[in-house]
């Protein structure tokens, strides 16, 4: 999994636009709701997500969360 995490973080770092994260499709870019409203996520796998805030063409407040534990 470490290689996948590094690759996804690199994609996030080099993205110029939020749309850049739509590919590959297995990123499953999502706009989050509820207590995480205003944040986005991409999937590492079925359990783990990279969650971030997008502004000024950059990802901010990046963190990795266990989706099943919040």
Which residue stretches match the model-derived regions?
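A short, surface-exposed loop/turn module that caps and links secondary-structure elements
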Residues: 16-40
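Enriched for short, Lys/Arg-rich terminal
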Residues: 33, 37-70
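A charge-rich, low-complexity, intrinsically flexible signal that marks solvent-exposed coils, linkers
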Residues: 1-9, 13-25
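Functionally constrained cores in energy, signaling, and assembly domains
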Residues: 6, 16, 27, 59-61, ...
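Generic secretory/membrane-interface signal
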Residues: 2-4, 11, 31, 55, ...
């Amino acid at each position: 999994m470490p290689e996948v995490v590094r690759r996804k973080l690199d994609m996030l770092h080099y993205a110029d636009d939020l749309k850049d994260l739509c590919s590959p499709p297995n990123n499953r870019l999502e706009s989050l709701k509820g207590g995480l409203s205003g944040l986005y996520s991409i999937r590492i796998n079925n359990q783990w997500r990279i969650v971030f805030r997008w502004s000024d063409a950059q990802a901010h407040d990046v963190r990795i969360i266990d989706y099943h534990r919040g």
